[in-house]
């Protein structure tokens, strides 16, 4: 259902801080042409935390419109209030989204039982396939494999995006949840190793600007051609790392603008544009990846 290179899409903004839908359409077309396996609209990289509900819904619906059935679209629907996460998921009922990506509740630090009940409530409210999203570095809570296993027993909880970077969890989760439960890396730097160990793909920041390379790399991995995939991975490794020289999505939006993929690199406060001191680092990573001369 979900595999390969799925992009965690940036949300392009104009200089007034409004969504730039012309650039969004160009990005969707770029990913279709590059062979990207799916698009996550309005996730962390899409600045979900600083979008209004109206903007959030419109962004997902416009992404679906621009995709026009040519590529699966996954809606970011996470919230730290369960009723809000349920509402978001229900808003996309019959919309055509392939799934919902729901981050663990952040800031309020629920227990493992609280996390289970949170996702159970979402699961019971909608038939849309749900992807759990564990990123403790941002949320201050860790969705443990044992809790994932409980959730995997629910009908429409089908996948996990694991952004811990802990490769030992792949085998643990596979053992607890079975091989049919989809595991997606949320960490570009370790994603290929994640797949080697039994994962199914990646929800990627790097793919925003190196979509064809990422799609090719994970297609090779799916064929067991890991040596060929690793050649691409090593070339992209500076990008994997340096796109986090400042908080995501600051560097990747700057890089997308530098490559002419979006009209502006604007980002909403409290995030600010990439600092002058960090720009040479990202520029060099683009050159190392072969994206700039």
From Swiss-Prot:
SUPFAM superfamilies noted in UniProt: Aldolase (SSF51569)
List of residues binding pyruvate: 45, 203
GO-annotated molecular function: 4-hydroxy-tetrahydrodipicolinate synthase activity
Lineage: superkingdom: Bacteria
Single GO biological process annotation from the record: diaminopimelate biosynthetic process
Function field: Catalyzes the condensation of (S)-aspartate-beta-semialdehyde [(S)-ASA] and pyruvate to 4-hydroxy-tetrahydrodipicolinate (HTPA).
Name this polypeptide is given: 4-hydroxy-tetrahydrodipicolinate synthase
Source organism per UniProt: Aliivibrio fischeri (strain MJ11)
Encoding gene (name): dapA
């Amino acid at each position: 259902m979900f595999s390969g290179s799925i992009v965690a899409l940036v949300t392009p903004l104009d200089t007034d801080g409004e969504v730039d839908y012309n650039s969004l359409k160009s990005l969707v077309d770029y990913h279709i042409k590059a062979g990207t396996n799916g698009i996550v609209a309005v996730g962390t990289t899409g600045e979900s935390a600083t979008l209004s509900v109206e903007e959030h819904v419109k962004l997902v619906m416009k992404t679906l419109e621009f995709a026009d059935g040519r590529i699966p679209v996954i809606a970011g629907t996470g919230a730290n209030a369960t009723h809000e996460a349920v509402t978001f998921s229900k808003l996309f009922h019959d919309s055509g989204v392939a799934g919902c990506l729901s981050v663990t509740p952040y800031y309020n630090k629920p227990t493992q039982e609280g996390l289970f009940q949170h996702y159970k409530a979402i699961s019971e409210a909608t038939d849309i396939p749900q992807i759990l999203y564990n990123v403790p570095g941002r949320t201050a809570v860790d969705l443990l494999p044992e809790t994932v296993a409980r959730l995997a027993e629910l009908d429409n909880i089908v996948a996990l995006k694991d952004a811990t970077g802990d490769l030992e969890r792949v085998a643990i989760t596979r053992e607890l949840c079975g091989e049919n439960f989809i595991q997606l890396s949320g960490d570009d730097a370790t994603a290929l190793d994640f797949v080697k160990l039994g994962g199914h793909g990646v929800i990627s920041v790097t793919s925003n600007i190196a979509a064809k390379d990422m799609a090719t790399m994970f297609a090779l991995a799916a064929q067991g051609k890991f040596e060929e995939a690793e050649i691409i991975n090593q070339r992209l490794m500076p990008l994997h790392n340096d796109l986090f020289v400042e908080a995501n999505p600051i560097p990747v939006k700057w890089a997308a603008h530098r490559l002419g993929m979006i009209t502006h690199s604007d980002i909403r406060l409290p995030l600010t544009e990439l600092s002058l001191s960090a720009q040479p680092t990202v520029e060099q990573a683009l050159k190392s990846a072969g994206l700039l001369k």
